[in-house]
Amino acid sequence: MPTLKELIAKLPKAELHLHIEGSLEPELMFELAQKNRIPLPYKSVEEVRKAYSFTSLQSFLDIYYAGAKVLLTESDFFDLAWAYLLRCKAQNICHTEIFFDPQTHTSRGVSFETVIEGITKALEKGEKELGISSFLIMCFLRHLSESEGFEILKSSLPFREKILGVGLDSSEVGHPPSKFERLFLECRKAGYKIVAHAGEEGDSSYIWEAIHKLQVERIDHGIRCEEDENLVEWLIQKQTPLTVCPLSNVKLQAVKNLSEHNILRLLRKGVLVTVNSDDPAYFGGYLNENYEALSEHLNASKEELKALAINSFKASFLSEEKKMDWIKQII
């Protein structure tokens, strides 16, 4: 009889909420800083790890943006994405839908083309050599203006075939989805799939706004949906997925501790919830560690872990045929 940890390791899984910049491990950060002669405010890898003690989304974002400064060349972005794909292979992540934040890089003088070419070359190699399928989702930084978002949308159009969808991330409170309503209308016209972070630090009204104002196909986080019973019922009825990130929620104190997390409660109610790692280099765990945490702290059963893995494919942007191919392997 395999243990739950062994079951998690063997389960085919999709990851739908992963920021590629958030997979930058301290070792690679140091290596790229030396190569590119970028000064870091840390003397060692250990010092960086110690600095990863955040108490809020904002304190995390401060170090996240500082770390991203080491990414300058196409090969840097390739190395970053390739390192994540090797983790995927080790954890039996068969499909991944990756967020990237072009504004984090274009604001530093790195071209959109440099970012997208480096990442997509790694993704192409990942499909060919590792058998991992993937899609790219471009995120707009919500603490910036909508007009800046329009500039990035324009920059993305020559690379339209490399980007499946668009999302919305960064500091949530004070930057509701409605701030970007016109931008997301244009994104829909361009044929992009639509997702958005909502209901992590922002209340349930942010989730409603993402649904009605942005017309999202998926909600990233969404854990505060339980503040509104009508919203929970809507999510169940429409089967709009939530890409939940348990270890991230605890690290950023959106949830006090894992034993209080609502992911399994939502699953049992019939909400289409999935498990994801968010920014794993910063939050102390990749996808399997998030599944293991649910087993350890919430006593997730074998059937619940399998249901979450099935949901990861159901909630993906894969074709129905490919979704079923993976789901059959889990059932």
Swiss-Prot record:
Site feature: Important for catalytic activity: 221
**Active site residues per record:** 200 (proton donor)
- Out of the domains of life, which is the source? Bacteria
Which protein are we looking at? Adenine deaminase
Q: Which cofactor does it need?
A: Zn(2+)
Q: What does this protein do?
A: Catalyzes the hydrolytic deamination of adenine to hypoxanthine. Plays an important role in the purine salvage pathway and in nitrogen catabolism.
Binding positions (substrate): 279
Query: Could you tell me what reaction this enzyme catalyses?
Result: adenine + H2O + H(+) = hypoxanthine + NH4(+)
Q: Which family does it belong to?
A: Belongs to the metallo-dependent hydrolases superfamily. Adenosine and AMP deaminases family. Adenine deaminase type 2 subfamily.
What is one process in the GO biological process aspect for this record? hypoxanthine salvage
Identify the species of origin. Answer: Wolinella succinogenes (strain ATCC 29543 / DSM 1740 / CCUG 13145 / JCM 31913 / LMG 7466 / NCTC 11488 / FDC 602W)
Return one GO MF term.
adenine deaminase activity
- Record carries keyword Chloroplast: no
